[in-house]
Amino acid sequence: MKEIIIYTDGACSGNPGPGGWGAVLAYGEHQKEIAGAEADTTNQRMELMAVIEALKAIKGSGWEIRVYSDSAYFINAIQKGWLENWQRNGWKNSKKEDVANQDLWKALIPLLRKNRVRVEKVKGHSGDRWNERCDQLARNAIKSLG
């Protein structure tokens, strides 16, 4: 089975402030770019929105998907088991505080379960062409807010 490759990025002008997200999805020779923006948000919310919207754009289930992100927040939550711990602990973090962005994490969980998703860290602003493209999509989305 072929793999769907997803690159994502989020950006914020001020944190909080106007924010945007961008994603590139690639399957074989096919490629799709998506982006969006919110008037008042945070960088971390935009990073998560990029992943959520990219996974929503995939039709069907059972796909092999690899998500590349420069967000340590997203990558660590998945790879280090933070997300599982948060769920198990009633959405409290290690400091017994409410987990930030619960609404987005809760929206992400069924999307992760629908397919076989692996996540990988990409260094931001390091010349990776797809990460740079996602950053451009996110920044253009912010500009579209006016």
From Swiss-Prot:
Residues involved in Mg(2+) 2 binding: D9, D135
Protein species of origin: Syntrophomonas wolfei subsp. wolfei (strain DSM 2245B / Goettingen)
Database matches in SUPFAM superfamilies: Ribonuclease H-like (SSF53098)
Main localization category: cytoplasm
Function recorded in the entry: Endonuclease that specifically degrades the RNA of RNA-DNA hybrids.
Broadest EC class assigned to this enzyme: hydrolase
Family according to the record: Belongs to the RNase H family.
KW Lyase (keyword) present: no
Cofactor requirement: Mg(2+)
Manner of cofactor binding, per the entry note: Binds 1 Mg(2+) ion per subunit. May bind a second metal ion at a regulatory site, or after substrate binding.
Annotated positions binding Mg(2+) 1: D9, E47, D70
Domain RNase H type-1 residues, every copy: 1-143
A single Gene Ontology CC term: cytoplasm
Name of the protein described by the UniProt record: Ribonuclease H
Keywords: Cytoplasm, Endonuclease, Hydrolase, Magnesium, Metal-binding, Nuclease
